[in-house]
Every structure is written in C-alpha cells, then in structure tokens.
C-alpha cells in the first residue's frame, strides 16, 4: 500500500489535522500537514494509542469456575441406602496472548511448518528412492526370470528333442517328477503367504492397542488436571465413586482375605499361605483410599493485617492457627482470654509477633474518610471575614454571666439555678462595630471538661477576675486552658464598683501565672469593668474586636457546613437536641449531618433565643433537631451528601467505640487482676444519674467518680440525658441504687415503681448540694473507727493476799473513775506490763461498781498476781469515732 499524507489520514479516521499531528508528536513522530505517513509510522501511532487507552492494562488471564452437585446413593448400615452429595468444582483458565506472544507464536508456527515441509520432502525423497530401488530390483528379477525362462525353454527344447529320441517309459517318469516338484513349490509358497498375513495382522492389532492405550492415558491425564481440586473424603462415598471394575476387584480381595482368615485359624501351611495372600491382597488395594495430606515441616510466616480491634478467633484465622494456640501463647504472656475475647491492636500485635508473624497495622475508617472527602466545596474557595468566638471564663461567682447579661441586655443570671451557670451558654451579640459570639462556661470546679471544650472552640478567651476576690483556683485553670489552646487572653477585672476592689493585687497575682498587663510590659489586654453599672463594657468590646482584627479571622461562607457540638440534651417533646457552633460553611435546614456517633437530617433549627431559622453561617450558635440520638459534647458536626453513607459511618463509629471500650476494659481487668485479688471488700454506692444536658452530666459524673476512696467507691450504673423513666427505677431497685435527677423529674410510671420498690429518689438543681449529699452518704458507709479513751488511774499503795482472789492491790484513785466492767492495764515505771480485766472492785468490804477520784479501793486483777507497790492501774474504754471523707 502506498504512503498517504497526514491530511488524507485525518479525513479517513475522522479527526482534525491538528489533533492527529498532536498525537503523532506525543508518539514521538514529527509531522506536518502535507507530510507522508508510512505504514511503520501508522503502526507506531496505533501502538502508542493502545497503550494510552489502557490496551496494555487489559487482563491477560481469565479464570472460570463451575460447581456441580450430584447425589450418590450408597449402601448404609442395616442394608439401607444413603444419599450422599458430591460436589465437583471445575476451574478453567483462559490466557490472552499479547502482540509479542502472537509474533513469537507465528515464528514458532513458521519454523514448525518449515521443519514439517523439510521432513515431508525428505520422506518423499526416501520414498522415491525406495520405489526406484524396488523398481530396479523388479526389473532385474524380471530380466533374470526372462533369461531363466529362455534357458528353460532352450533346455526343454533340447530335452524334447532328447525325449523324442527316448523311449515311452522314460518319458512317463520324467512327467511324474515334474508334477511332484510343482506341487511341492506351491505348498511352500502358500505357507509363506499365510505366515506373512499373520504377521501383518498381529502388527495391526498391536498398533491399534497402543493407540487406544495412549489415547486413554491422555484422557485420564486431562481429567486429572481438570478435577485436581476435587477429593472424596468419606470411604463409602469413595467406594461409590469408583468404577465397577475397581469395586469388583476390591470385593474379590475381601472374599480372598476372609478365606485366608478362615484358613489361618487351622495353622500350619494354610496359615502361612493365608498370610502371604493377605499381603498380596493388601498390596493391590485401591490407591484412591490413601490419605493425601502431608504435614508441613517448615514454619510459615505470614503478613497479618490487624485492625483496631480483633477477637481471638479472628486473629487465629488470620494467622492460620487454632485459637487454642493463641490462648496458650497469651497464657504464657500472663493473660487469660477466651475465644471470643476482643483484643486491642497493641495486644494483638504483641501476640502475632511473638508467634513469628509480620504484623501490618491497618486503619478501618476508609469509608469515613471517603464520606468526609466527598463534601469538599466545588469551585474556588472564597474566604470571607467572620465574627470572633469569645469564651467567658473565670472562677465561680466572679460575675461572668452577669457581665454577658449586661452585654446582651437580658436577665439570664437570675434564671440560673443558685445563680451560677451549669452548662455552656452560646449567644451572639450585634454591636456597633460588628457581631461577637460569646460562650459562657461554668466556673465551678466540677466543670473542667466543659471549660476545656469552650477553650478549644474559641478564638479569644476573656478571663473574668473579681477585683475584690483576686485569683482563685478556677482562674488559674482557665489560664492553663487558654495557654494549652494557644488562644489570646483578655483579662476583664469585674466588680470595680465595690470599695474593696484592689487592681494592683489582681495584676500581681495574675503576673505570677504568666499573665502580664500591657502597662507592666506584657502582651495581655486588661479591661476594668462593672457588670452592675456597665462601666468599661464598651472598652472591653472594643478590645475584643481589635484583637479579632489582628487575628484576621476568615472562613468559607458558601458550601457545606462544619462545626462543633457545644451542648446536647434530650427534650421530651422534641427528641435529641444539639447546640452546634458553626465554624465554616452555611448550615441549612434539611442538611444531612454526621455528628460523632449520631447522624440525621435537620428537621428544625433555632437560635439561642428560641426563634426558628432556616440557615446559620460561620460563628453562629444554633440548636438543631432531627439527630438519631444525643451526641457527645465536643463532637465534630459535619454536613455530608449521602444519608445512607452517613448512617454506615455512624454505625461503624458506634461499633468501633464499643469494641475499643471493651478492649480497654478487658486490658484494665487483665492488668489489675492480681491487684484486685489482694484488695479487701470495697463498699459501693450505686447511683442512677439523669441530667438535663450532656455537659452537666459529664461534670457531675467526673465529680462523683472523684469522690471514690479505697473503702467506698461511687459506681454510676446508669446515666443519661432526659427524664427519669420506669427502666431507670427498675434498674435502681434491682441494684440497690439511689436515683439522682439534676434539673429533671421522674415520669408517672417511674414514680409508681419508685413508690412500690421504695427507691431513694433525690432531685437537685445546684451541683454543690448534690456533691455534698453524696459525700454524706459515702461517709455513712465508711467502716467505724474505734479509739481507746482512759477513764481512770489508780496507784497501788499496798498489796494484800486473799485465799480466794490471790493478790489484792490497795489503791488510791488519782484520776477519773475506776469502773468494774472496764478493761485495765498495769503499768510499772510507766511501762505496760499487763493488760486484762478487773476481777473484783471493793471499797472497804463492799463490792462496788465504780470508785471516784480521791477514794481508796481494793482491786483484784484477773489471772495476775504480780502486783507490786508503786504500780499504776489504768482503766480505759473503747469508743467509736465517726469518720469523714
């Protein structure tokens, strides 16, 4: 085929000339519009395009599997037939040859063809040569035969001539001799022909037999390759699967063995013959009954892929060993486990490496990462300025909520129980210079986790310090949270309207903890305010906005929202309610939210004042309804696209949380197993705790768990958000627990159960009272403490002998009162030499119960006669002392 131009080739393939020239260039060929294209260049371009479009990546091998199930009817016990299923699995592999293989195959075929032609040519030449030799030999034989016939004729003519001259008797004898000679030659020739025919027939039969045998062997080999993975393991099924000839042979062998056994009982030669035949029969047993497995002699080291949690059974499957081997190994390592025990990743890694395997640690949150990666915003990300998130922190009763209340111009502090904040309040305030979002955190010591969460989600921390009170423990803790979160700190010195205000004291105390005023050369801004009169509040807001400008706070406004859960609760009428601080994007009603272990579609949104809204931008706190459950405070809230995938991720997180929790608990149990054995009996105070919001529940739980001692342990057997239910009451009755409700009440069914079971139910609205009463209950459970108190002291002045009581000490009571029923100690030179009890106490001759200070008496000490003058007798009693925590 003649070369064609680039333009003509572009017209043929239906592409533009520029695109074709570009593809030639990518393939390494430089061409112009009018250049010619050879066949080799076309092939080069075609190979390049195939490689680019995945031609080389196509699979070269395909394996097909087919499974057939058949039923065999075999004879069972008692002559009954039994159906056995036989499963046959067939595997066939097709291999696709690539271009190089095709070329090599073509070359091999050409070479084989040339060899076959050469061989055929050589065979033809040999055949022609053989035919020529046969023809020459035949001609020579014909010539010799003709000469012989000519000689015979000449001889016959001569003989005839002679015969004519002979007598008639001689002629008859000659004819008879010739006849006999011809008969003998004919018989010899017939015998040779018969022998040749027999030899040819024998060779033909042998060739046919060999051909059949070779074909049968080839067929058996192919069948063996096709069914190499199929084994019949049951002996009855194996016999049923054998062909009839093998079964007949086995039956004949069995009958022969039975006969030999009968003969062997007679002993002698029959026994020896029987044993020999038995051995021969055993040697001819079918090989299909032999076991085909040999135990591996070398250890196999595998790459074991371990997730975050794994059970003992799953780990055994990964390492291809029995679960008992892992249990033995862990017993050697000092741990008692069961086959369904959940192991954490670290423990499983130690076990696998101890058994000689290589461990590959994997993370199982691929679906989670995929769902979160799919929410990336489309197009160009546009950052816009956002409002600062300010957290108000400080010690309890230093005026945090009052200051924020003045800023919001609403009475919030009066509505808080006890006048203190017990959960995070999120508000946003519009000022003349812009919007500010405030997070009001509790100041009580119990709310450490809530304050830490507030510092994590914030941009600026405002530390409120009372001018008359100074730096307190929670003030120091707030400073530590701000430093840990690397958050700018602004100090608001409150209660400046009080006459006891001391600014210099506050500055010096804060300086001891690394908070230096700008006046003293530090970096922290100080604002002196009064939440009561409002003095200095404008300066504080101006300082907050100035600090926000320095930080250059920006966020994506358009796109899918993400934020953090500030607070969560279970509302009886609305269900799970979560307060979310939006950090980026816009949260809209109807979005699908993945929130920690929970998920759901937003059914309603409300701002901090309870008004319904449809969307919320960055730095806006909002309440959402529609989650599947109450999320934990501090969880990240993310909007995703697919609700089904969100549910899968939430379920995966729940399962992982449960497995990790169980593994951690089990690890703790194993580590503390021997320590627990040595501990004595520990009393437990069981509590069923319900609170109004998640943050308060966390704070109360941490505070109560911190009250536990070596003798009394606080055990919170159930906790949750929402009202006290009948289930809670039943659980409390069964576990002998007290029910505690913090800003929640029991429903009607729960109250009936509480009355019928006489459960101790207590309501609280201030955390101080709750902790104090639980502490009092724990104090009542403490084991009593006993103390010995001296009630009297007598000095021995003389010793008398009594036939009944032995030595009687004549004493003078110098201190307190001597009582007959009390135990005593005998002191000599202020050293205790005997401890016992009084046997008799007399004044003059009368028995008395007690003798007071300054009186004389006679004292008989039981089982002690070594009383001397100058000894002291000390009388004491054991009193119970109430213990406190």
UniProtKB/Swiss-Prot annotation:
Gene3D superfamilies per the UniProt record, alphabetical: P-loop containing nucleotide triphosphate hydrolases, Putative DNA-binding domain, N-terminal subdomain of bacterial translation initiation factor IF2, Translation factors, Translation initiation factor IF- 2, domain 3
G3, as annotated region: 440-443
Presence of the UniProt keyword Magnesium in the record: no
Region (G5) location: 530-532
Basic residues bias spans: 253-266
GO function terms (MF aspect): GTP binding; GTPase activity; guanosine tetraphosphate binding; translation initiation factor activity
Domain tr-type G: 385-554
InterPro entries linked to this entry: DNA-bd_dom_put_sf, EF-G-like_DII, EFTu-like_2, IF2_assoc_dom_bac, IF2_II, IF2_N, P-loop_NTPase, Small_GTP-bd
Stretches the record annotates as G1: 394-401
Cited CDD domains: IF2_eIF5B (cd01887), IF2_mtIF2_II (cd03702), mtIF2_IVc (cd03692)
Principal subcellular localisation of the protein: cytoplasm
Keywords from the UniProt entry: Cytoplasm, GTP-binding, Initiation factor, Nucleotide-binding, Protein biosynthesis
Cellular component terms per the entry's GO annotation: cytosol
Main function: One of the essential components for the initiation of protein synthesis. Protects formylmethionyl-tRNA from spontaneous hydrolysis and promotes its binding to the 30S ribosomal subunits. Also involved in the hydrolysis of GTP during the formation of the 70S ribosomal complex.
Family: Belongs to the TRAFAC class translation factor GTPase superfamily. Classic translation factor GTPase family. IF-2 subfamily.
Stated name of the protein: Translation initiation factor IF-2
Organism from which the protein derives: Shewanella sp. (strain MR-4)
High-level lineage: Bacteria, Pseudomonadati, Pseudomonadota, Gammaproteobacteria, Alteromonadales
Gene behind this protein: infB
């Amino acid at each position: 085929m003649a070369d064609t131009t680039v333009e003509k080739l572009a017209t043929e393939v239906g592409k533009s000339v520029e695109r074709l020239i570009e593809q030639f260039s990518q393939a390494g060929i430089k061409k112009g519009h009018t250049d010619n294209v050879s066949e080799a260049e076309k092939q080069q371009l075609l190979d390049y395009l195939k490689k680019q479009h995945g031609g080389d990546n196509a699979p070269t091998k395909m394996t097909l599997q087919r499974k057939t199930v058949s039923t065999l009817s075999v004879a069972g016990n008692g002559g009954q037939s039994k159906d056995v299923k036989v499963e046959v699995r067939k595997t066939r592999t097709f291999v696709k040859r690539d271009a190089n293989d095709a070329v090599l195959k073509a070359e091999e075929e050409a070479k084989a063809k040339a060899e076959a032609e050469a061989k055929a040519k050589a065979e033809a030449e040999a055949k022609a040569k053989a035919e020529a030799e046969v023809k020459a030999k035949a001609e020579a034989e014909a010539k010799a035969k003709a000469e012989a016939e000519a000689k015979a004729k000449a001889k016959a003519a001569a003989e005839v001539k002679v015969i004519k001259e002979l007598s008639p008797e001689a002629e008859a004898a000659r004819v008879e001799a010739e006849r006999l000679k011809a008969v003998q030659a004919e018989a010899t020739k017939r015998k040779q022909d018969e022998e040749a025919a027999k030899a040819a027939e024998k060779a033909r039969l042998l060739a046919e037999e060999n051909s059949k045998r070779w074909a049968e062997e080839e067929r058996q080999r192919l069948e063996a390759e096709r069914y190499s993975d199929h084994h019949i393991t049951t002996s009855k099924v194996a016999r049923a699967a054998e062909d009839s000839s093998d079964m007949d042979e086995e039956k004949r062998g069995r009958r022969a063995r039975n006969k030999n056994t009968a003969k062997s009982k007679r002993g002698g030669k029959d026994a020896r013959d029987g044993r020999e035949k038995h051995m021969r029969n055993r040697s001819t047993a079918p090989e299909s009954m032999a076991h085909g497995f040999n135990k591996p002699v070398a250890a196999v080291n595998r790459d074991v892929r371990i997730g975050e949690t794994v059970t003992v059974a799953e780990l055994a499957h990964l390492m291809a060993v029995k679960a008992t081997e892992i249990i033995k190994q862990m017993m050697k390592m000092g741990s008692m486990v069961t086959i369904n025990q959940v192991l954490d990743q670290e423990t499983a890694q130690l076990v696998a490496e101890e058994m000689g395997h290589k461990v590959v640690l994997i993370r199982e949150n691929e679906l989670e990462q995929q769902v979160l990666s799919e929410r990336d915003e489309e197009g160009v990300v546009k950052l816009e300025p956002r409002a600062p998130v300010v957290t108000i922190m400080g010690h309890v009763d230093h005026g945090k909520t009052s200051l924020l209340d003045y800023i919001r111009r609403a009475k919030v502090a009066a509505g808080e129980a006890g006048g203190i904040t017990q959960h995070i309040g999120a508000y946003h305030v519009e000022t003349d210079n812009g919007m500010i979002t405030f997070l009001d955190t509790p100041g009580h010591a119990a709310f450490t986790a809530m304050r830490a969460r507030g510092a994590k989600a914030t941009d600026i921390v405002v530390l409120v310090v009372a001018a008359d009170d100074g730096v307190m423990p929670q003030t120091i803790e707030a400073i530590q949270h701000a430093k840990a979160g690397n958050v700018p700190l602004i100090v608001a010195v409150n209660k400046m309207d009080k006459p006891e205000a001391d600014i210099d004291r506050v500055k010096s105390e804060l300086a001891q903890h690394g908070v230096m005023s700008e006046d003293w050369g530090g970096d922290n801004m100080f604002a002196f305010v009064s939440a009561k009169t409002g003095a200095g509040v404008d300066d504080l807001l101006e300082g907050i906005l100035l600090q926000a400008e320095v930080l250059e706070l920006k966020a994506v406004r358009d796109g899918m929202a993400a934020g953090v859960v500030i607070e969560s609760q279970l509302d009886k009428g609305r269900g799970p309610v979560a307060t979310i601080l939006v950090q980026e994007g816009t949260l809209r009603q109807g979005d699908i939210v993945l929130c920690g272990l929970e998920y759901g579609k937003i059914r309603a949104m409300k701002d901090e004042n309870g008004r319904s809204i449809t969307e919320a931008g960055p730095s806006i706190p909002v309440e959402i309804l529609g989650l599947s459950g109450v999320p934990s405070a501090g969880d990240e809230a993310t909007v995703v696209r697919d609700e089904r995938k969100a549910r899968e991720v939430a379920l995966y997180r729940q399962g992982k949380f449960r497995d990790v929790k169980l593994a951690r608990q089990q690890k703790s149990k194993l580590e503390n197993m021997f320590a627990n054995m040595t501990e004595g009996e520990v009393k437990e105070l069981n509590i069923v705790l319900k609170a109004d919001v998640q943050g308060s529940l966390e704070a109360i739980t941490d505070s109560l768990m911190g009250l536990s001692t070596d003798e009394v342990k606080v055990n919170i057997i159930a906790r949750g958000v929402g009202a006290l239910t009948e289930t809670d009451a039943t659980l409390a009755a069964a576990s002998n627990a007290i029910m505690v409700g913090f800003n929640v009440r029991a429903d009607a069914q729960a109250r009936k159960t509480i009355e019928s079971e006489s459960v101790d139910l207590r309501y609280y609205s201030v955390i101080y009272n709750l902790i104090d009463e639980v502490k009092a209950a724990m104090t009542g459970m403490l084991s009593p403490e006993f103390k010995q108190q001296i009630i009297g002291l007598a000095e021995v002045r003389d010793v008398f002998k009594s036939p009944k009581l032995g030595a009687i000490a004549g004493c003078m009571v110098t201190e307190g009162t001597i009582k007959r029923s009390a135990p005593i100690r005998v002191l000599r030179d202020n050293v205790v030499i005997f401890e016992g009890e009084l046997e008799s106490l007399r004044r003059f001759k009368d028995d008395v119960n007690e003798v007071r200070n300054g009186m004389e008496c006679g004292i008989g000490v039981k089982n002690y006669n070594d009383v001397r003058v100058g000894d002291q007798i000390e009388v004491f009693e054991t009193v119970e002392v109430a213990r406190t925590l």
